[in-house]
Amino acid sequence: VRKRTAGTVAVLGATGKTGRYLVARLCERGYDVAAIGRDRARLEALDERARPVVADLEAPATVKAALAGAERVASLAHARHAQALIDALPAGCARVVVTGSTRRFTRLPDPAAEAVRAGEAAFARAGLPGVMLHPSMIYGAPDDRNVNRLLRLVRARRVIPLPDGGRHRVQPVFVDDVVEAYVAALERETAPGPPIVIAGPEPITYAAMVRACAEALDRRVAIVPLPAGALIAAARVARALGIALPFDADEIRRATEDKVFDPGEMRERLGVSPRPFAEGLRLKCARGWC
């Protein structure tokens, strides 16, 4: 029998790349955790201290039942589900944390970014006691997509082609820091208010990320610049001809847009200081996830 010491927290999206670590961290802190997701088998593989609860944001009645009695709610589901979550919240819920994305700041035409902006607007209109977090590129989990792709590339090739030589900047954030940000957003009195960006401490170029991955694997690589415009044109031609490429034109466009953010609110309102990319990558590899 679990001893409830810190209150009840419901976590939606509990089986995702970040959700499963948040569930474990909240259990460590003594919460009675309702881990909510669509797949019972995956839910039952989470921290055994959590209660698996099957629900689907596309089926509002199931979510309302899953959230009944929750004192705090953290949703790691896509921001397009914000209104469904708002409608399902129990009366008297003391804190709500929802997930957006720094993709909402893009200047490129992007339906995914529009969905995040719409979710942010819905959450703001609701006037709930809580906050929306906008994570940047999250890395560090065993199955993180972006960094694992770079690690595979570095293992397979000595010469790495990058759009514009990889000079464009991103600000990846380590998964442990993301989890601590969610915990703080659930607990700290300074958390509620405008959305908070969850990002690494400073921008890093794609080229520097590749070199850090090579160093972590004790490999030497050479980076070859490829004009982004030519890659976009090639992707368009390949698509028209039905040829599958490992990238599409939209991916190249996004890769040439600097993604630079100020993590000041993350530090000030949440008390979380994100670690540099190289440090997070070392931790990922030390855990055997490289």
Residue ranges and their predicted role:
Residues 9-29:
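N-terminal Rossmann NAD(P)H-binding glycine-rich loop of SDR-like oxidoreductase domains
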Residues 36-40, 57, 77:
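N-terminal Rossmann-fold cofactor-binding loop
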